[in-house]
Amino acid sequence: MSGTMPLQPTFYGFIGDTTDALIIFEACLSGKLFHVPRRPHDRERQDLIKSGNIFVYEEHASGIKRWTDSISWSPSRILGNYLLYRELEKPFPPGEKKRARGRNGKSTTQSGGITKSRPRNSVPFQTGLEHGNEYTTVPSDDERHLVGSLVDSYDFKEQGLVKKTISITYQGVPHHLVSYYHVEDVKAGLLPSPVDDPRLRGVVPRTELLTGQNFRAPIEEAQHGTYLSGAYMPNMDHQYAPIGFPTHTQQPALQQQPQQQPQPQHQPQLQYQPQPHQHQPQLQYQPQQQHQPQQQYRPQPQHQPQLQYQPQALHPTAHGYPQSYGQTWW
């Protein structure tokens, strides 16, 4: 019965991280989404194996032991808890071992000999890259999330598909997820994330999916959506926010520090302004500001009798003239 019914993908979009995949698995277990009952037939593959389609199947009920789609894929590479494959320009010749080519663009055979070099193809991530050109710079982290280490190690098909797979076990039964996407579709934000689908709002993976798996990498916390689409923008804003806020709070502190530093330097200058004039008597008489008569008689140094009789009024002793004179000027 299932062989005659048209096959439909489980979900349309892009699976960015492990949490996205667990949401899809949970939606299938709870009945919000559906497992596929079989593999696509040859006549269906052209319409079903395309960017954005995601298939989830349960191994026992479907009888699927190996998912086939008639596309020539590169060897798999690990990316977190996923396996990545990239579509090849042409399949490997029969009997040839699938070896990655070296840095010089030449591939080695199983016997260790060198075959003729083949031009490298790469998805044009960087501006100015065209078909046949090599990477001039190392791909960014966002690009690594899309192709992993499958950059230019094989003869990849230009604008070819990427296959991304992940598996879980629930109550002893294996469940598999197979997704397809074009790199440019993900970069352009054309493939929605599971959290963007209204049907999947409020879907929380059950405990068995979170703790009962043998994942290679820890499950991401609070990271949903694609790496380049709008669904991932809140996380990007959260990363840039801590950089901006401290700078605004630190700016007034940095402005206050240079203002406070010169203040103690100017204060001693204000106190010691009479020093450049070298009026030592003024420095001695600063603590004796209460004696106004002495300050009034400063401009009359020639009148010695007046200076001698000033201490007489304060000190009536007859033998105190030399002592009062010394106290007044020295």
Swiss-Prot record:
Residues 93-123, 239-306 are annotated as: Disordered. The keyword Glycosyltransferase does not apply. Keywords: Activator, Nucleus, Transcription, Transcription regulation, Virulence. One of its GO terms (molecular function) is DNA binding. Its main location: nucleus. One of its GO terms (cellular component) is nucleus. Induction: Expression is up-regulated during infection of tomato roots. Pfam families: Gti1_Pac2. Residues 105-114 have a biased composition (Polar residues). It comes from the Eukaryota. The keyword Membrane does not apply. It is found in: Nucleus. Residues 250-306 have a biased composition (Low complexity). Global transcriptional regulator of pathogenicity. Acts as an activator of parasitic growth. Not essential for colonization or penetration of the root surface, but required for expression of genes encoding effectors that are secreted during infection. Involved in conidiogenesis, but is not required for conidial fitness, overall (colony) morphology, vegetative growth or carbon source utilization. Belongs to the MIT1/WOR1 family. This is Global transcription regulator sge1. It comes from Fusarium oxysporum f. sp. lycopersici (strain 4287 / CBS 123668 / FGSC 9935 / NRRL 34936).
